[in-house]
Swiss-Prot record:
This is FAD synthase. It comes from Methanosphaerula palustris (strain ATCC BAA-1556 / DSM 19958 / E1-9c). Keywords: ATP-binding, FAD, Flavoprotein, FMN, Nucleotide-binding, Nucleotidyltransferase, Transferase. Coiled coil: none annotated. ATP binds at T9, F10, H14, P15, G16, H17, N92, Y119. Belongs to the archaeal FAD synthase family. The lineage of its organism: Archaea, Methanobacteriati, Methanobacteriota, Stenosarchaea group, Methanomicrobia. GO terms for molecular function: ATP binding; FMN adenylyltransferase activity. Its EC number is 2.7.7.2. Homodimer. Catalyzes the transfer of the AMP portion of ATP to flavin mononucleotide (FMN) to produce flavin adenine dinucleotide (FAD) coenzyme. It is an enzyme of class 2 (transferase). Pathway: Cofactor biosynthesis; FAD biosynthesis; FAD from FMN: step 1/1. Signal peptide: none annotated.
Length: 153
């Protein structure tokens, strides 16, 4: 059985996330997805959606066989437990595959590291772009404390 690990924040799920997971699943039999902990996200703004809800959403996706939260202190701990054959990186994840491969070897892990390409030129395949679109199109009507009809959101 070929085990694949995909990782990410998965805040504001969008088709780019689904593409990444579908392409990752094609590389093996069992897809494990490690969802970043809220407190560990330091390379971009903190997630909007809490980690437990992001985990629940990722776990419900068809390509995902197992979803788990990352470790709060050691990102390699779940990888050591899973012992994957392949670790996939999204096209915009800030990991150098060569550096990651060396870090894995230092822990006696021999997973192949594969970067998954982008989903194409889709406007809303980025959580940042989704937030920007909400601000641009709905910002004035989304005031804190204002009674807003959910249909308007």
């Amino acid at each position: 059985m070929r085990r694949i690990v995909a990782t990410g924040t998965f805040d504001l799920l969008h088709p780019g996330h689904l593409f990444y997971l579908q392409e990752s699943k094609k590389l093996g039999d069992e897809l494990y997805v490690i969802v970043a902990r809220d407190r560990n996200v330091k390379h971009k703004p903190r997630p909007i959606i809490p980690e437990e809800q992001r985990l629940q959403m990722v776990a419900a996706l068809k390509p995902v066989d197992h979803a788990l939260l990352g470790d709060t202190t050691d990102m390699f701990r779940p990888i050591e437990a899973i012992r994957p054959d392949v670790i996939t990186l999204g096209f915009n994840q800030n990991f150098d595959p060569a550096v990651l491969t060396e870090a894995l070897k230092a822990r006696s892990l021999s997973a192949e590291v594969v970067r998954i390409g982008g989903y194409g030129d889709r406007v809303l395949c980025s959580s940042r772009r989704i937030v920007q679109r909400v601000i641009e199109t709905r910002g004035p009507s989304l005031r804190v404390g204002q009674n807003t009809d959910p249909e308007d959101l």
